[in-house]
């Protein structure tokens, strides 16, 4: 009997599409991290520390611009695909609208960067590196990860991502040898990604029989307008999650910034976990909520408490191993970094507490609630983190970032009870039946 239960449990676990989605999303993130770790010493050796810094600075600008290119479609796209995955005509219009809209935003972002460089003479130290980096905007625009998320078929996109990163690594080895070739680093990354993405779009067209229509301008405008709140929400969330180091830079020394930055980077890698949970389960959650509230509640409850258990384990493990992790990465004993990491180790756990709220927002397509919660959070995070950083430095900022995760839980729970009381009450009332 026990063998039968165990076999059923583990067999069902790995056959579950949401679990597969999660595994493949983690594979994508892991491959990105591994390739970054491999490429860093190669680039530093080839283009020097200064060139490496300018390449990363350009990449930071592109990452911010990619928020505009994504325009919230990475959140809304999977939902639309999940709801219409059996209607190829509807899918064709969804894919066409999203791809063309993102390409349009990439063109506008590129125009903005060109004007900033040649019209306003900004980014003086790395203008040409940044200009050659704009290909990454079109790589982002054509990446159909949202489509495969909605279909809950992530295997192909994860393999394609690994292959594009290997092409990038090969390009670095073959073509980047001197500091004056710095401008080609991000260009190679963008070209590899864009090339693989075009092959994926061809696969979608020919193998999955999805047609590409040329949308009318009014359709593109309507699509962008519909996603405007998600775009603004993403901006606020990005600042709230990633703005801590900038806040600390106003009050701390370079040494403190360096030690906090090391701990924060580790924390940010761990914080990917709750995001991956949300992205992997919400396409199926959307379909379940539309068809059967009871099944939705059971599914969400399992995912929610499962993610809490995993994140608790990861946080406690990181807390215990903090001295060894810092020693491994810095090659020296940085007691201050260890203190920061032990505090920030609980950021992913606190973030996981809000998974259920966010999934409900996304499943019900409540962009306004996402917008309100993210901007209320930003209005909380900035003064609190500024104040705590001013009085207590890195320790204060760590407390501020932890409180930010708890505050967003409170904000989203209140909004959920106001707008989705039926779903939230069903979720909590059914806990005892697990």
Regions found by a protein language model. Give the residues of each.
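Hydrophobic alpha-helical transmembrane segments
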Residues: 57, 134, 158-208, 377-380, ...
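Transmembrane helical elements of multi-pass membrane transporters/channels
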Residues: 20-36, 157, 163-168, 183-204, ...
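Interfacial segments at transmembrane-helix termini and the short loops linking adjacent helices
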Residues: 14, 19, 116-133, 320-352
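Membrane-interface junctions at transmembrane-helix termini in multi-pass inner-membrane proteins
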Residues: 15, 127, 137-160, 346-375
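Helix-loop junctions and terminal segments of transmembrane helices
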Residues: 70-86, 267-291, 360-363
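Interhelical loop/hinge segments that connect adjacent transmembrane helices in multipass membrane
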Residues: 2-18, 182-186, 195-241, 284-298, ...
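Signature of the first transmembrane helix
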Residues: 16-74, 169, 229-255, 382, ...
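Membrane-water interface segments that mark the loop-to-transmembrane alpha-helix transition
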Residues: 20-33, 58, 63, 71-117, ...
């Amino acid at each position: 009997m026990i063998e039968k239960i165990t076999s059923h449990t583990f067999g069902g676990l790995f056959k579950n599409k949401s679990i597969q989605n999660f595994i493949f999303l983690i594979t994508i993130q892991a491959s990105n991290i591994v390739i970054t770790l491999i490429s860093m010493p190669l680039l530093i050796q080839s283009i020097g520390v200064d060139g490496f810094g300018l390449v990363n600075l350009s990449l930071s600008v592109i990452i911010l611009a990619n928020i505009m290119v994504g325009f919230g479609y990475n959140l809304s796209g999977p939902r639309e695909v999940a709801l219409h995955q059996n209607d190829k005509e509807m899918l064709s219009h969804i894919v066409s609208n999203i791809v063309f809209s993102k390409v349009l935003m990439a063109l506008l972002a590129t125009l903005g960067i060109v004007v900033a460089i040649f019209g306003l003479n900004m980014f003086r130290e790395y203008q040409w590196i940044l200009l050659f980096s704009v290909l990454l905007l079109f790589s982002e625009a054509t990446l159909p990860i949202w489509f495969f998320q909605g279909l809950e078929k992530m295997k192909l996109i994860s393999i394609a991502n690994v292959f594009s990163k290997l092409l990038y690594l090969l390009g670095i080895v073959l073509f980047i040898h001197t500091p004056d070739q710095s401008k080609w680093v991000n260009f190679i990354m963008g070209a590899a990604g864009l090339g693989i993405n075009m092959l994926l779009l061809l696969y979608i067209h020919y193998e999955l029989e999805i047609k590409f229509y040329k949308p009318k301008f009014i359709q593109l405008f309507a699509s962008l307008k519909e996603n405007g709140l998600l775009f603004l929400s993403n901006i606020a969330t990005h600042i709230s999650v990633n703005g801590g180091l900038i806040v600390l830079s106003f009050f701390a020394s370079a040494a403190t910034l360096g030690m906090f930055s090391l701990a924060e980077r580790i924390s940010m890698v761990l914080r990917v976990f709750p995001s991956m949970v949300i992205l992997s389960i919400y396409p199926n959650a959307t379909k379940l909520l539309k068809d059967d509230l009871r099944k939705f509640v059971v599914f969400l409850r399992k995912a929610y408490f499962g993610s809490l258990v995993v994140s608790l384990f990861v946080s406690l493990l990181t807390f215990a191993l903090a001295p060894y992790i810092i020693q491994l990465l810095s090659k020296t004993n940085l007691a201050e970094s260890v203190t920061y990491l032990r505090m920030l180790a609980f950021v992913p756990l606190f973030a996981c507490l809000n998974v259920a709220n966010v999934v409900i927002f996304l499943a019900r397509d409540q962009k306004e609630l996402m917008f309100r919660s993210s901007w209320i959070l930003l209005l909380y995070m900035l003064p609190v983190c500024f104040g705590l950083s001013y009085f207590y430095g890195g320790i204060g900022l760590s407390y501020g970032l932890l409180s930010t995760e708890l505050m967003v839980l409170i904000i989203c729970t209140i909004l959920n009870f106001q707008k989705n009381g039926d779903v939230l009450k069903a979720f909590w009332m059914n806990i005892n039946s697990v």
